[in-house]
């Protein structure tokens, strides 16, 4: 590489959905992560190969609990000349926690396989950036998995959670909005 070649800054992603995509692909806490799918098989999104080629240094890996929806009804409504879709209903923690735990487990399996490091401090993040290791900040998008007494928050924090977006496109006990 010549001294005049442009230096590409490391890419740090403010949000990615790889955990929910892997979860939706049928992965769970009881099933092993399909490492081959993560290495090269995530069309249109991140995978290990795309991360490496694109200079991906790390990012916020979102844990997200989807709303149950009837896509046929939604598609019909959205094809009308004018439509108004209400926000999805609140999801109770007992429904959200298993999905969130499964996605957190996927992130931990990715770390155990050596593809990234879950960062829980700025020192860990800086070390990853300095050493070329993908830095993962565990993020919850919508605080549905967090109970009123914050027991689940403590559990997720111990698992590596360092960022929460309190609401997504539905209300929960902490707020409402998009």
Per-range role (PLM):
Residues 1-178:
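N-terminal hydrophobic targeting/anchoring segments and the immediately downstream early-domain regions
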């Amino acid at each position: 590489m010549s001294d005049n070649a442009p230096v590409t800054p490391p890419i740090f992603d403010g949000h990615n959905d790889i955990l929910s995509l892997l979860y939706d692909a049928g992965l769970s806490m009881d099933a092993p992560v399909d490492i081959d799918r993560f290495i090269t098989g995530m069309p249109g999104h991140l995978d290990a190969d795309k991360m490496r080629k694109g200079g991906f240094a790390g990012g916020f890996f979102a844990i997200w609990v989807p709303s149950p929806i009837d896509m046929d009804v939604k598609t019909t409504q959205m094809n009308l000349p004018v439509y108004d879709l209400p926000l999805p209903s609140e999801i109770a923690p007992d429904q959200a926690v298993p999905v969130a735990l499964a996605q957190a487990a996927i992130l931990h399996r990715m770390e155990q396989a050596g593809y990234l490091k879950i960062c829980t401090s700025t020192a860990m993040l800086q070390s990853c950036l300095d050493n070329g290791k993908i830095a993962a900040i565990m993020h919850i998008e919508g605080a549905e998995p967090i109970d009123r007494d914050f027991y689940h928050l403590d559990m997720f924090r111990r698992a590596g959670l360092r960022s929460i977006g309190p609401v997504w496109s539905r209300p929960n006990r902490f707020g409402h909005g998009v």
